[in-house]
């Protein structure tokens, strides 16, 4: 696996692979990789002949007071994990390489509606930063397909909409969330949790599983079901950001008629913000 730091080197390597008839897969990350990321790379390697991963901690998607400066940078360990997972090329640019004109005047990509509620409400500008950097990376790599984790469900919905609306010829694959044995969704931010907090954190997935089972059993009183789970999460000591039952594609509030449903939660455990979701396809 080669590591390149400039767009010119990236494009040369991808052009060489494509000229050999290879299908290009892409997995964008912010580094500090765990086995969930490795699953995304493995999926790309199954679907493509040449896999590019990127590591870039994108300042545009961090708001004031968020963890940009303390976000872990673990390049050497990440390179080893990518190699083991089947990555062929790592693109690890600097901020200056990604935003050579600075960020103030940078052209932005905005996906309205899908970006506005849920995480978008408490992290204004976040999804604009995500859409902007992903569109830049897509233009740099020009992959045939890209893999994203379903743990960041709203992000996946935003990227699918952007690719559709801007006619990008890229297949987007959503890969199921990888979980610890106790159900906690793997996340780079789990490393911020104390041992005590880590023991509490699986309450989020328990709540999702309970409300999901109730909905599958035919209970469509979403307000009542939500209130029960909110009470359980707050009783465990988390500070809730949101707990919502939404339609699975457009993320509008779900109705009893919907067959494609996603339940999404975000909550703070101490200073650490955790997110999770459960996607349901009803018969």
Swiss-Prot record:
EC number assigned by the record: 6.3.2.1
Residues where beta-alanine binds: 61
The protein's annotated pathway: Cofactor biosynthesis; (R)-pantothenate biosynthesis; (R)-pantothenate from (R)-pantoate and beta-alanine: step 1/1
GO biological process: pantothenate biosynthetic process
Xref: Gene3D superfamilies: HUPs, Pantoate-beta-alanine ligase, C-terminal domain
One GO MF term: ATP binding
Pfam family, one: Pantoate_ligase
Catalytic activity entry: (R)-pantoate + beta-alanine + ATP = (R)-pantothenate + AMP + diphosphate + H(+)
Main location: cytoplasm
Active site, renumbered: 37 (proton donor)
Keywords: ATP-binding, Cytoplasm, Ligase, Nucleotide-binding, Pantothenate biosynthesis
Entry keyword ATP-binding: yes
Subcellular location: Cytoplasm
Gene Ontology CC: one annotated term: cytosol
Residues that, per the record, bind ATP: 30-37, 149-152, 178, 186-189
Positions of (R)-pantoate binding: 61, 155
Oligomer status and interactors: Homodimer.
Function according to Swiss-Prot or TrEMBL: Catalyzes the condensation of pantoate with beta-alanine in an ATP-dependent reaction via a pantoyl-adenylate intermediate.
Note: The reaction proceeds by a bi uni uni bi ping pong mechanism.
Family, per entry: Belongs to the pantothenate synthetase family.
Stated name of the protein: Pantothenate synthetase
